Amino acid sequence: MSAASSPDRPPAWAHPSAEVEPGAVLGAGTRVWRFSHVAAGALIGGDCVIGQNVAIGPGVIIGARCKIQNNVSLYAGVVLEDGVFCGPSCVFTNVTTPRAEIDRKAEFRPTRVGRGATIGANATIVCGNALGAWCLIAAGAVVTHDVPPLALMAGVPARRVGWVSHAGEVLGADLVCPRTGDRYAERPDGLRRVINLSGFGEDISEEQSASVG
């Protein structure tokens, strides 16, 4: 394990029952809890919380300040940007048509989860899709296509049922966040914050919208 450190933050820490393989990189302040496994080649940013019984595969990239709750497996090809929340037992895949007796490692498809996104408990993210920044995937949803930034997704298969603010609040018809007062507007390419009273979170760029379009 390579554990980055800084003068004002504690070094990364792993519970004695966790296994962090040599060649995995953990950022300063990151904590890995009981019975979790971080494979060689995984890169985890600073100040992350990795819950119990989490499996992080080789080549997985996790940004800073992410929270991975219990019983989550992240496979090769998964990238989580900064501030992503993965709820308990949410599921990622990396092959669309797996067979036990056929090697399909060459067919792994990547999954990218954008800045600040939330994935609810027991949700499934089918590989090859991108989740936009600050989106919210409801518990138990099954995501089978790209998700726009700030979208609220629910159901099987998941569909957009509304919008959420950067603070994670469901937006009503007025598109005003009830927690922060931030105001949003629908544009042809998605939702945009037009009044930022809270100062929380980065606004969505045209490039971010296009990347999941």
Where are these regions (language model features)?
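Internal alpha/beta core interface subdomains
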Residues: 133-136, 142, 178
